C-alpha cells in the first residue's frame, strides 16, 4: 500500500471517530436528561403516595352504628 492509501484510511478513521464522539456526547446528554426526569417523577410519585396515606388516615372511619332503617 502506498502512503496515500494509508493517509486516506487514517483520514477516514479520524472522521468516523469524530462522528462517534459526537454521537456518544448526544446520547450522554439524552441519558442525563432522562435520569433527571426519572428522578423528578420518582419524587412526585413518593409525594403523591404520602398525600394519599395522609388523606386515608384523616378520613373518618366507618362507624358501627346500624343504618337508620333498623
UniProtKB/Swiss-Prot annotation:
Query: Would you say which domain of life the source belongs to?
Result: Bacteria
Outline the segment boundaries, as ranges, of region: Disordered: 51-70
What Pfam families does this protein's entry cite?
Answer: SlyX
Recorded hits in InterPro entries, A to Z, give: SlyX (IPR007236)
Its family remark reads: Belongs to the SlyX family.
Q: Any idea what this protein is called?
A: Protein SlyX homolog
Amino acid at each position: 500500500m502506498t502512503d496515500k492509501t494509508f493517509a486516506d484510511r487514517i483520514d477516514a478513521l479520524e472522521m468516523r471517530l469524530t462522528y462517534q464522539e459526537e454521537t456518544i456526547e448526544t446520547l450522554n446528554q439524552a441519558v442525563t436528561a432522562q435520569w433527571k426526569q426519572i428522578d423528578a417523577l420518582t419524587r412526585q410519585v413518593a409525594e403523591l403516595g404520602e398525600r394519599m396515606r395522609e388523606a386515608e388516615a384523616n378520613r373518618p372511619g366507618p362507624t358501627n352504628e346500624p343504618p337508620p332503617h333498623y
